[in-house]
Curated annotation (Swiss-Prot):
Similarity remark: Belongs to the phenylalanyl-tRNA synthetase beta subunit family. Type 1 subfamily.
PANTHER family (UniProt xref): PHENYLALANINE--TRNA LIGASE BETA SUBUNIT, PHENYLALANYL-TRNA SYNTHETASE BETA CHAIN AND LEUCINE-RICH REPEAT-CONTAINING PROTEIN 47
Cofactor: Mg(2+)
ATP-binding in keyword set: yes
Compartment annotation: Cytoplasm
Name of this protein: Phenylalanine--tRNA ligase beta subunit
Domain B5, first and last residues per copy: 402-477
Chain residues that bind Mg(2+): 455, 461, 464-465
Record gene name: pheT
KW Aminoacyl-tRNA synthetase (keyword) present: yes
Bound cofactor: record note: Binds 2 magnesium ions per tetramer.
Key words of the record: Aminoacyl-tRNA synthetase, ATP-binding, Cytoplasm, Ligase, Magnesium, Metal-binding, Nucleotide-binding, Protein biosynthesis, RNA-binding, tRNA-binding
Length: 794
């Protein structure tokens, strides 16, 4: 971002403020000044000349010119193609040293004495990159609508065209993207030096009602990416087709190659002031009033574009296409103002491989509601050039962003956090010339936030702003003090440590994965119904822009990577937190098994991975938290995510609260990623901590031999195992435990939407050794209860 002293002088009285003081102020306010440039020192002397006569020198491309410099007339030989009589030009006289290092001397060219130089812009310090190719070999013609230049012939031309300026090149931090509007830096400096801003009230005000029925449709893939759509339009008279030299040089100092059309140039000056970009279209060139924002393939790149009847009007971030662009003959000008999701525009910038004034602002988080300020500023500029016949107010087609209106904070909260003793009066004075309004009731301060400061959303942000304006250098450095205290017992942490040790003992590897993922992936794998995603304001990549909503996908990605390097025998787990914008924080556990449960390469012993091995691990975790396993419910309902096996999956509930999921990956997904059979389980540890039984009860162990019976049943996939078990165990005595020991599926069972389960029942008693007759009698009760449910016993 570039700020110039001359631009600041239009709004602030800087008579008693030096460039060094401005430099110090910017750095003190948190804007790092990368470099400064004293343009006035680039050229020792430049004066305004008037070409009275220009004649071609025979047999050459040179012209012999008589140039009036006020006190006398100079004879100057010039080879520029555009030099001609009746032009105001920049003259470097004899003995002057100009920016390219040349010191002028009197010399003969083609036997004609040349007494100085008529200068081109690149010769006096303007970079070639911001000069059109056709203008690079031309001399510069000076113009100013407000000055009678004939009265200034022989005067210092640097003051007339703005080359007496001083530049500050500022590096903005991401949270201060609002300062891509130079008006914001203006307010900061006015506040720092306690200066009143002038000339901002000289506004054009004669806006007519906007009755233009313009439609801008949004393609489905961009509907959620467009925050704001607004437009206005102007009827122009085109009295002037050239910018004043000061404005043209100002654009070039801001690294902008000015257009040949003054209307476009004025919109760029408005963009520098407000940070809102303008898309200008000649209304008379549109085929209809129906526009569309959509992705189209242009030069083999999918770019966000504005179209009209399937014709390309504007590639967002570039100038309007020539067929629809404004020119010096345009009478009706449409002004469209957009605010677009920065991540999308960063992708657009990468595809376009350029950085310009438009894209620099599209890719940053800026107040989406700048349209009225931008339209007002643009109208002021058009009015200064007497170009407006009629101007029409802004009409809003889409507005999704609402500015944070206010924040309340107590005085002691600010002082405690910053280590200061500021008073309410002092704090109010810090914001004197900024667009903050501060009221208080006793020691409670109410801050009405500057709408451009979308980075201020919390009390901590306010405290940081107070510290910045007060100056960090004024805050006393106080070393941290540590108070020792008795550490409270944390049963949840102890259980988590036991859980970690248990999984490590089973051969699992503790894994740490990235907390950030893509927005689409966060939505797609939102297994735990997280409502308000946390998105980074400016992520380095779209792949890492949103806090994850689950741990499962992260561990699956780890498994895919390990399989790609031939590490296929995997047992992984991770314990981490899940967050959302509603202050949600959930502690989750995920574990993953892939390929074999056990593999001994010496004797070729293999135990294949299966659902019930992972379920047993899960139930052992439930036992660790002393949960009542009879309250656990398993339901199969994960068909929405295609990466999960449609049949081998379960959703787990405890007392009707969602605990988590256990599932096998879809074989197609496994095949695509070259994975062996892989099972994943993710649970919410906060629910386990909520329902854990903290009381450990010692139970008497039976001294007698237990006996078991196995039973295989066929049940419908629509019937839950818990329901079958609840009815089967009605009035059954001596039963100590039960568990599923096998699951069987074949084509016929799958066809009939059923499965075969083998359940083991264990019987024992504390008082006596059970006889076979007693055991069989209770086992028959189970069989009878199951038959009453019309469940097939195999």
């Amino acid at each position: 971002m570039i700020i110039t002293r001359n631009w600041l002088k239009k709004y602030l009285n800087l008579d008693n403020i030096s460039n060094d003081q401005i430099n110090m102020a910017l750095n003190s306010l948190g804007f790092e000044v990368d470099s400064v440039y004293d343009l006035n020192s680039l050229n020792s002397e430049l004066i305004l000349g008037y070409v009275e006569q220009s004649k071609q020198i025979p047999d050459t491309h040179l012209k012999l010119n008589q140039v009036n410099i006020g006190t006398k007339s100079l004879q100057i030989v010039c080879g520029a193609s555009n030099v001609d009589a009746n032009q105001f030009v920049v003259i470097a006289p004899i003995n002057a040293t100009i920016a390219n290092g040349l010191t002028l001397t009197s010399k003969k060219i083609q036997n004609y004495e040349s007494q100085g130089m008529i200068c081109a812009l690149n010769e006096i310090g303007i970079d070639l990159s911001v000069i059109n190719k056709e203008d690079q070999l031309k001399i510069y013609n000076v113009s100013d609508k407000n000055l009678d230049l004939k009265k200034y012939i022989g005067s210092d031309v640097k003051q007339i065209i703005g080359l007496d300026d001083y530049l500050f090149e500022i590096d903005l931090t991401l949270n201060r993207s609002d300062c891509l509007a130079s008006f914001q830096i203006l307010k900061e400096l006015a506040n720092y030096f306690d200066l009143k801003i002038k000339n901002l009230d000289n506004n054009f005000s004669d806006f007519k009602k906007n009755n233009l029925d313009l439609k801008i449709d949004l393609a489905n893939q961009v509907k959620d990416q467009i925050k704001t759509i607004s437009y206005s339009y102007f009827e122009l008279n085109n009295k002037n087709d050239k910018l004043d030299s000061k404005d043209e040089i100002f654009l070039k100092l801001n690294q902008i190659n000015s257009s040949n059309h003054s209307i476009t140039n004025l919109s760029l000056i408005s963009t520098l002031s407000t940070a809102q970009t303008h898309i200008l279209i000649d209304l008379d060139k549109l085929k209809s009033s129906n526009l569309k924002l959509e992705f189209i393939n242009h030069d083999n790149k999918e770019l966000l574009c504005l179209t009209n009847n399937n014709k390309l009007v504007n590639i967002i971030g570039l100038d309007t296409q020539n067929e629809f662009n404004v020119d010096n003959n345009s009478k009706n000008v449409l002004n469209i103002m957009l605010n677009i999701e920065p991540n999308l525009m960063r992708k657009q910038q990468k595809l376009l491989n350029i950085s310009n004034t438009y894209l620099q602002r599209y890719i940053k988080p800026i107040n989406p509601n700048l349209f009225n300020l931008a339209n007002q500023t643009f109208s002021n500029l058009l009015n200064d050039y007497q170009l407006i016949n009629k101007a029409y107010e802004v009409k809003i087609l889409k507005q999704t962003f609402k500015n944070k209106q206010s924040l309340e904070i107590k005085l002691n909260e600010i002082n405690d956090l910053l280590g200061t003793n500021l008073t309410i009066k002092q704090i109010k004075s810090l914001f004197k010339h900024l667009d903050f309004k501060i009221t208080n009731k006793d020691d409670l301060l109410d801050f009405q936030i500057d709408q451009n400061r979308i980075d201020i959303t919390s009390k901590n942000d306010l405290c940081e702003e107070v510290a910045r304006l007060y100056s960090y250098d004024k805050i006393d450095e106080i070393p941290l003090s540590f108070t020792s205290f008795k550490k409270a017992k944390n049963l949840n942490l102890k259980l988590e440590n036991k859980l970690t040790n248990y999984l490590i003992g089973l051969g699992f590897n503790n894994t740490k994965t990235y907390s950030l993922t893509s927005l689409n992936e966060a939505k797609y794998w939102n297994l735990f119904n997280i409502s308000e995603f946390i998105n980074l304001v400016s992520p380095l990549s779209n792949l890492r822009q949103t806090y994850r909503t689950n741990l499962s996908k992260s561990l699956i990605d780890v498994a895919i990577f390990n399989h790609s390097i031939n590490n296929k025998e995997l047992k992984l787990f991770e314990i981490a937190d899940i967050y959302d914008l509603n202050n949600l924080k959930q502690r989750h556990l995920v574990f993953l098994t892939s390929n074999h449960i056990y593999k001994n390469s010496l004797n070729q012993q293999l135990i294949e991975n299966n659902f019930y091995y992972n379920k047993e691990i899960l139930e052992n975790i439930f036992n660790l938290y002393n949960l009542d396993l009879s309250e656990i419910q398993y339901q199969s309902d994960l068909n929405l995510i295609k990466e999960i096996h449609p049949y081998i999956n379960t959703t787990i509930y405890y007392q009707n609260q969602l605990i988590g999921y256990l599932y096998k990956l879809n074989p197609k997904f496994e095949s695509e990623n070259k994975l062996n059979p892989t099972f994943v389980c993710e649970i919410n540890l906060d629910i386990l901590n909520q329902f854990k039984n903290s009381f450990i009860e010692a139970k008497t162990l039976s001294k007698f031999q237990s006996s078991s019976r196995d039973l295989t049943i066929e049940i419908s996939n629509d019937l839950t195992y818990q329901k079958v078990l609840f009815n089967a165990l009605s009035d059954v005595k001596y039963l100590k435990s039960h568990k599923i020991v096998d699951l069987y599926l074949d084509d016929n069972l799958i066809k009939n939407n059923t499965k075969a389960l083998t359940i083991q029942f264990v019987f024992n008693d504390l008082e006596h050794q059970l006889t076979e007759n007693e055991i069989n009698q209770e086992f028959e009760k189970i069989i009878k209860n199951i038959k009453q449910m019309k469940v097939v016993i195999r």
